[in-house]
Amino acid sequence: MKIDLTALVTESRNKASENIDVLSTVEMLTVINQEDQKVALAVEAILPQIADVVDAIAVAFQSGGRLIYTGAGTSGRLGILDASECPPTYGSNPDLVVGLIAGGHKAILKAVENAEDNRELGASDLQDLGLNEKDVLVGIAASGRTPYVLGAMEYAKSVGATVATLSCNPNSPMTELADINMTPVVGPEVVTGSSRMKAGTAQKLVLNMLTTGAMIRTGKVFGNLMVDVEATNAKLVQRQKNIVIEATGCSEVEASEALSQCDNHCKTAILMVLSGLDAQSAKAKLAQHNGFIRNALSDQ
């Protein structure tokens, strides 16, 4: 079956880079850099739609639902990257944000032939994951037409999940299936069709916003501090101490003592120092207020 890609913005030729192969290295990189500067503006143009998805994800998290990313190639890898960073950054369950890629784990490192063209695989991967009406699915594809993602979106709609798209081509087949469309139109790529470049950068910026925004909305950030960070290495042990110090103004000794008394739960240590509660009482108070430090502090 012949596929017509000529109408896709991401497949168009970029006039600014038509002679990039004869430029000096600095000139070549200047063209790339100038094109990259358009990406943040394209994302800015869709902030209201991104906000709608963030709010939907926050509701899902608070209702026992999950955020599921699905994509092929670069798009799938970006979803997996974003999902994998949530547990160490926010202390979230690894099952809370999940990234799926056409072709499975082996496709993370190496392309799997024809996997992205398998519409049924997109659906069955979600079925295996037990997708349900509490979940939010974000279908990621620069083209907006990847069969694997379309199959996943159709299945998600059939079970009542909230469905959003992240693509870089307006009026794509994916937009017809979604409840919320996020379409940062970044224009033609420097290398024609290489959507890992501007489109991929736009996708990464949006994914950062989705999980960061949802985690803030569910109490995992106090001020601008990642108060649910887990101390899984030496750097993060020190970061926990620094966060407690920044949040409370206490000494390093006081921060260390508080953390040691609450099994290194950063959020609990902060509440202990600020409220004078012991570890057990601070944990209970946080649980009472769904992990929101500000709400726990106001209930004194």
Swiss-Prot record:
Its EC number is 4.2.1.126. It is an enzyme of class 4 (lyase). GO terms for molecular function: carbohydrate derivative binding; carbon-oxygen lyase activity; ether hydrolase activity. The active site is at 85 (proton donor), 116. Residues 57-220 form the SIS domain. It catalyses: N-acetyl-D-muramate 6-phosphate + H2O = N-acetyl-D-glucosamine 6-phosphate + (R)-lactate. One of its GO terms (biological process) is amino sugar catabolic process. It comes from the Bacteria. Gene3D superfamilies: 1.10.8.1080, Glucose-6-phosphate isomerase like protein, domain 1 (3.40.50.10490). Keywords: Carbohydrate metabolism, Lyase. The keyword Cell inner membrane does not apply. Pfam families: GKRP_SIS_N. Pathway: Amino-sugar metabolism; 1,6-anhydro-N-acetylmuramate degradation; Amino-sugar metabolism; N-acetylmuramate degradation; Cell wall biogenesis; peptidoglycan recycling. The keyword Phosphoprotein does not apply. Specifically catalyzes the cleavage of the D-lactyl ether substituent of MurNAc 6-phosphate, producing GlcNAc 6-phosphate and D-lactate. Together with AnmK, is also required for the utilization of anhydro-N-acetylmuramic acid (anhMurNAc) either imported from the medium or derived from its own cell wall murein, and thus plays a role in cell wall recycling. Belongs to the GCKR-like family. MurNAc-6-P etherase subfamily. A lyase-type mechanism (elimination/hydration) is suggested for the cleavage of the lactyl ether bond of MurNAc 6-phosphate, with the formation of an alpha,beta-unsaturated aldehyde intermediate with (E)-stereochemistry, followed by the syn addition of water to give product. Homodimer. NCBIfam families: N-acetylmuramic acid 6-phosphate etherase, PRK05441.1, PRK12570.1. This is N-acetylmuramic acid 6-phosphate etherase. It comes from Aliivibrio fischeri (strain MJ11) (Vibrio fischeri).
